[in-house]
């Protein structure tokens, strides 16, 4: 059941929109939801520290959707048009997308899901003594990992999968504080055909933007791939009249390999520039690993794995 956090009822009287809901799940995690934003939040620490951290997360979430809505038109513009934002989460989106804009078409909306997670996590852990914490927004995850700690994040071989079929272990020393997954059949539209591209980066917003762009480039021209204009599927899409993937038919192993190689080149470019820490690219059970992250992979349903230079699910 959804209820308000202790000491702060969700009501119009304290400036909180009536649609904002919050409550503790049976396992002690915090659930925050407002409109399309649905967060699952967990942390490890002393009970009083966790209570305060969760209250701070609630405060950080309150009003965030409304601030984004006010900036939506600007944040839907390409980075090259120099979009502006009046809120912190919008600034995170712009900063994340700007890292990739020199060679790629990208709007700040590419980082919206986990810019929200980054923002809530930042507020949540401020002045709090927690060993580990995370904010999961639809499988894209912002992480807080104290020195000497590590976290395990569930990952999926297809973005629409409901249950993780693999896991990656992330230590504090790696510097990865964000995990994001993108693919053609997920809730966001894609220009490519990747089943899943999972990226580790220094922030969740950077991981989200990078995963989107790498997944776009896992692609090839083929009659089995169906596409449509983005704005014909979603009115006002930030992708405009770009062709997005709507269906992927049967491909040979060589064709899948060709598509993965294209995305791998983009991932390597991002790795070399320092924009990401590593990436896992999957299509039809073939996988490519970019960066020194093979040791992080606990398991995954893939074959023909190669290494150069999520929907996430569970987090432990």
Functional labels for PLM-detected ranges:
Residues 2-11, 17-20, 47-136, 202-289, ...:
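Alpha/propeptide regions of enzymes that mature by internal proteolysis
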Residues 20-33:
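Acidic, low-complexity proline/glycine-rich segments
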Residues 27, 36-38, 148, 194:
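A general secondary-structure signal for short beta-strands and their flanking turns/coil
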Residues 28-29, 186, 267:
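Generic recognition of flexible, low-complexity loop/linker segments
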Residues 34-47:
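Generic N-terminal amphipathic, Lys/Arg-enriched alpha-helix
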Residues 46, 148-149, 158, 293-296:
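A short, sequence-level motif marking secondary-structure junctions
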Residues 107-202, 206-207:
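Glycine-rich anion/phosphate-binding loop at the beta-strand->alpha-helix junction
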Residues 143-145, 288-292:
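Amphipathic coiled-coil signal-relay and dimerization helices
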């Amino acid at each position: 059941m959804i209820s308000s956090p202790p000491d702060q009822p969700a009501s119009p009287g304290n400036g909180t929109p009536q649609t904002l809901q919050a409550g503790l799940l049976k396992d002690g995690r915090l659930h925050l939801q407002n409109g399309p934003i649905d967060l699952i939040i967990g942390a490890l620490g002393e009970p009083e520290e966790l209570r305060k951290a969760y209250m701070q997360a609630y405060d950080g979430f309150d009003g965030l959707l409304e601030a984004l809505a006010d900036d939506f038109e600007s944040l839907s513009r390409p980075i090259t048009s120099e979009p502006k934002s009046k809120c912190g989460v919008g600034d995170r989106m712009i900063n994340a997308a700007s890292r990739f804009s020199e060679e790629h078409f990208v709007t700040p909306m590419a980082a919206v899901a986990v810019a929200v997670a980054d923002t809530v996590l930042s507020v949540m852990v401020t002045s709090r003594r927690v060993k580990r914490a995370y904010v999961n927004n639809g499988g894209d995850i912002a992480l807080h990992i104290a020195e000497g700690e590590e976290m395990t994040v569930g990952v999926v071989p297809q973005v629409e999968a409901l249950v993780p079929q693999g896991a990656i272990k992330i230590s504090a020393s790696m510097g990865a504080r964000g995990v994001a997954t993108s693919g053609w059949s997920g809730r966001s539209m894609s220009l490519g055909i990747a089943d899943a591209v999972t990226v580790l980066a220094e922030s969740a917003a950077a991981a989200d933007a990078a995963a989107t762009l790498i997944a776009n480039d896992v692609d090839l021209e083929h009659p089995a791939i169906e596409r449509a204009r983005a704005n014909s599927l979603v009115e006002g899409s930030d992708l405009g009249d770009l062709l997005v993937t709507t269906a992927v038919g049967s491909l040979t192993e060589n064709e899948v390999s060709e598509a993965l190689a294209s995305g791998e080149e983009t991932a390597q470019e991002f790795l070399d520039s320092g924009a990401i820490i590593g990436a896992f690219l999957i299509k039809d059970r073939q996988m490519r690993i970019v960066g020194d992250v093979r040791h992080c992979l606990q398991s995954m349903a893939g074959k023909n794995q190669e290494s150069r230079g999520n929907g996430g699910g569970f987090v432990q």
